[in-house]
Amino acid sequence: MSDQQLDQHELQQEENKLIAQRKEKLAAVREARAIAFPNDFRRDAYFADLQKQYADKTKEELEAAAIPVKVAGRIMLNRGSFIVLQDSSERLQVYVNRKTLPEETLAEIKTWDLGDIIGAEGVLARSGKGDLYVDMTSVRLLTKSLRPLPDKHHGLTDTEQRYRQRYVDLMVNEETRHTFRVRSQVIAHIRRFLSERGFLEVETPMLQTIPGGAAAKPFETHHNALDMAMFLRIAPELYLKRLVVGGFEKVFEINRNFRNEGVSTRHNPEFTMLEFYQAYADYEDNMDLTEELFRELAQAVLGSTDVPYGDKVFHFGEPFVRLSVYDSILKYNPQITPADLNDVEKARAIARKAGAKVLGHEGLGKLQVMIFEELVEHKLEQPHFITRYPFEVSPLARRNDEDPSVTDRFELFIGGREIANAYSELNDAEDQAERFMLQVKEKDAGDDEAMHYDADFINALEYGMPPTAGEGIGIDRLVMLLTNSPSIRDVILFPHMRPQA
């Protein structure tokens, strides 16, 4: 047994010993009272609200007012006379007043452990150091914690364990709690932003008979009653556009997508997307709307349009750079010439040398995108709208009027990561049918991410869809930016993990 394994074994033995002691204490609680886990305590205040409401009250003013409160929380520290509690908003001390609390209660308090949850009544007071606390007149145990909290000096530092046991991570790490509060704020602000502009929030199917709306490999399942294969959705796009056909001219959805692909710091098989569509608009309108949304989000969450991330600062207050795929390759790779990009064989050689997975049947447009992904994408630090994607890789986007080889599409990159994807929607049913057929050929040639042919969607387009612009924004990656989080797992409450051995 290695030293590391020995240390781990000793730690496990110590934890088992502590758990056994706590179970003995719980057994004593069960014996002493009829209900070991009571549910009749009602608090009337959160700690953060108390701190804010009485911030300007002096020690003398609080003594004179004798403000009664009922609070509840988890024991995070026990300093003898003072116990530090934590609720969902903040931490606050409660004072173990030996002059007013019954002897029986004082004896019970001595048996409580870190992690136990208690309910306390008392009056607000302020210490000589200026700290607000509750001078307890009564207190009782509400929940006995059977497992010890992580060591107070080291906390829960193992990253993988933080992801596996997020409930413990949330207990002991304020930074984690802050991240998920921000996530909630971001989603609430997006809803408000779009609703104020006339967008209708909708819900579309998570189980689909044909996976569509993105180039990705789906999860497949089986519907027993209908005896048919079904797929977890990879995107809601085709259903949202059906709604535009039906007359809902501004719609959005914030929900989960599922893609049966790799796991990394940027990818999780289950992730949250915002998708929105507006009729009588194009992709340039969406660029303007996206800039406005991102500035408002940064200001609302950070109080500034400058967004710190790692050792960089992204400037959301400045106009986002707008550059085509083609021009971005030339700008960031001066060794590549227009002649290289316009020749299939030369482009294929560049893509292969750059590390792209070249199969050999790709057209020029797809090769250019491969080169972009390998040689440009990671260099796009400040916000960039990359536009005019080749039509081969944009089966749902409208062709550009001036150059039909490209589409009216953009992807937004910040910090070298794709954050959003948008385009003027293809509303020509015949063109869409042809592109679906091209995707079917790609799939037959071995591309697992190529799209299926969706006959019902073609049927919908044949009724007529107005000129429309649509966009998808990755909520998880956006929250990563706004919380300075290096991994997508830091912003997903329960990320997917391999089973423990």
UniProtKB/Swiss-Prot annotation:
Cofactor note: Binds 3 Mg(2+) ions per subunit.
Gene Ontology MF, one: tRNA binding
EC numbers for this chain: 6.1.1.6
Keyword Cytoplasm: yes
A Pfam family: tRNA_anti-codon
Keywords in alphabetical order: Aminoacyl-tRNA synthetase, ATP-binding, Cytoplasm, Ligase, Magnesium, Metal-binding, Nucleotide-binding, Protein biosynthesis
Name of this chain's protein: Lysine--tRNA ligase
The organism of origin for this protein: Pseudomonas paraeruginosa (strain DSM 24068 / PA7) (Pseudomonas aeruginosa (strain PA7))
